[in-house]
Amino acid sequence: MNKNKSNKLKGIVVALKANFLIVEIDHKNFKDHSFDQFYGKIRLLCIRRSKLNYQGLFIDVGDIVCVESIDYKNKRAVVSDVEPRQSFLKRPAVANVTLVSICISADEPLFDMEQTSRFLLTAECANIEPLIILTKIDLITKNDLILYINKFKSWGYDCIPVSIHNSQGIDSLIERLRKTKLTVLAGPSGVGKTSLINHLIPTVSLPTSSVSKKLKRGTHTTRHVELFAIGNGSLLADTPGFNRPEIVCEPSDFAFLFPEFRTQLSNSQCKFRNCLHRDEPGCVIDKDLERYPFYRQNLEEMINSPLPYQAG
């Protein structure tokens, strides 16, 4: 069988399929050189030790795991342990994420400020750096593009505008993604996430779908999370699209999830320490900020929700 039961190698979970884990390991770590045809990184179909289930250890895409009992020829192994996570994104469930790239369409489907903010808050809640990728910029004018960039800048976020039709911005995006270890590509359905991955990594060829003319939104093409190599040791996760991420946060912490609010709160202090930035006297938050109405609406939902600190 050519199994090496004594060897334990580290790998990363790149996909979950039924009850199996797909784990990628580096061939340079192999002690058995009978299979040198497997040059570079290979993927193993793995089961998990039952003790992991007994210990209540869940394993998700992005987790760093130990594999043993490796069958090199048939590319199978057993996951025996999982390392502590550096970060975790709950939806979609991905471990050890270093960047959340949120794909937002400039047109088709139309830009939705609330929807975009909810995706940004998902990253902020997990304390993971967000990046906005503005797709389909070939459908808008240069003036509209400038308005988008300035909008996101006023929110406190970087934006990389791209088009897969004329490749504008693609080189800049690849350069940025290769500077971080694991990027999750998130966003609503129909904004072109999967098409963008196909453009960034031509060997992948993932299925895509068009935006519904009746509903004015995309349909779900990606059904599960999977990691793909994008060069320089960096990985990119394609994730299922969903259109309304929930916000789960304590009301007292909510304002600190908005970079434009954090800037004002770092420069000045509200009169009251427990200020929620509603109508309290001495509040330093500018009520004319573009996203303040969104903040206020969702804050009220959190306070009045029967579920603990949830809006939407």
From Swiss-Prot:
Gene Ontology cellular-component terms listed: cytoplasm
Predominant cellular place of this UniProt entry's protein: cytoplasm
GO biological process: ribosomal small subunit biogenesis
Residue span(s) of domain CP-type G: 86-245
Gene3D superfamilies: P-loop containing nucleotide triphosphate hydrolases, Probable gtpase engc, domain 3
Subcellular localization: Cytoplasm
Keyword Nucleotide-binding: yes
Enzyme Commission number(s): 3.6.1.-
Cofactor remark from the record: Binds 1 zinc ion per subunit.
Keyword Cytoplasm: yes
Superkingdom of source: Bacteria
Enzyme class at the top of the EC tree: hydrolase
Keyword terms: Cytoplasm, GTP-binding, Hydrolase, Metal-binding, Nucleotide-binding, Ribosome biogenesis, RNA-binding, rRNA-binding, Zinc
Positions of Zn(2+) binding: C270, C275, H277, C283
Pfam families: RsgA_GTPase
Cofactor dependence: Zn(2+)
GO molecular function terms noted in the UniProt entry: GTP binding; GTPase activity; metal ion binding; rRNA binding
Annotated residues for binding of GTP: T135, K136, I137, D138, G187, P188, S189, G190, V191, G192, K193, T194, S195
Family: Belongs to the TRAFAC class YlqF/YawG GTPase family. RsgA subfamily.
Chain's role: One of several proteins that assist in the late maturation steps of the functional core of the 30S ribosomal subunit. Helps release RbfA from mature subunits. May play a role in the assembly of ribosomal proteins into the subunit. Circularly permuted GTPase that catalyzes slow GTP hydrolysis, GTPase activity is stimulated by the 30S ribosomal subunit.
Oligomeric form and interacting partners: Monomer. Associates with 30S ribosomal subunit, binds 16S rRNA.
PANTHER family associated with the record: SMALL RIBOSOMAL SUBUNIT BIOGENESIS GTPASE RSGA, SMALL RIBOSOMAL SUBUNIT BIOGENESIS GTPASE RSGA 1, MITOCHONDRIAL-RELATED
Name recorded for this polypeptide: Small ribosomal subunit biogenesis GTPase RsgA
Organism expressing this protein natively: Prochlorococcus marinus (strain NATL2A)
Lineage: Bacteria, Bacillati, Cyanobacteriota, Cyanophyceae, Synechococcales
